[in-house]
């Protein structure tokens, strides 16, 4: 099993339409991206990371669960915000 440990964050991609900028959030972070790509290549993969107790943290945790990794441990930190 490949175990990737590190950051999981939200990548915010902006788009300007009719003078209004909107943003879409995507789950990212190099260690998490590595885990997802390895899983898609057929490897058995786990990921361990930490997010803040905030809306972005809940978003990336929900997105990470959709990746169907073999092991997932995302801890919540009440004292820090999730990185964007």
Regions found by a protein language model. Give the residues of each.
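Positively charged, low-complexity intrinsically disordered leader regions
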Residues: 1-18
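Conserved N-terminal subdomain of the carbohydrate kinase-like
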Residues: 44-84
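Glycine-rich phosphate/pyrophosphate-binding beta-alpha loops
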Residues: 11, 29, 83
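Beta-barrel outer-membrane channel/assembly domains of diderm bacteria
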Residues: 8-12, 33-41
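Conserved donor sugar-nucleotide recognition element shared by glycan-biosynthetic enzymes
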Residues: 27-31, 56
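N-terminal glycine-/serine-/threonine-rich phosphate-binding loop
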Residues: 1, 24, 36
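Short pre-catalytic strand/loop immediately N-terminal to key active-site residues, enriched for Gly-Thr
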Residues: 18-28
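Short, glycine/charged-enriched secondary-structure capping and boundary segments
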Residues: 17-20, 61-63
């Amino acid at each position: 099993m490949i175990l990737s440990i590190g950051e999981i964050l939200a990548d915010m991609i902006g788009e300007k339409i009719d003078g209004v900028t909107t943003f879409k959030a995507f789950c990212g972070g190099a260690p998490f991206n590595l885990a997802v790509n390895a899983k898609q290549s057929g490897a058995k993969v786990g990921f361990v990371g930490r997010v803040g107790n905030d809306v972005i943290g809940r978003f990336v945790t929900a997105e990470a669960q959709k990746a169907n990794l073999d092991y997932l441990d995302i801890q919540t930190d009440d004292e820090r915000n999730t990185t964007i």
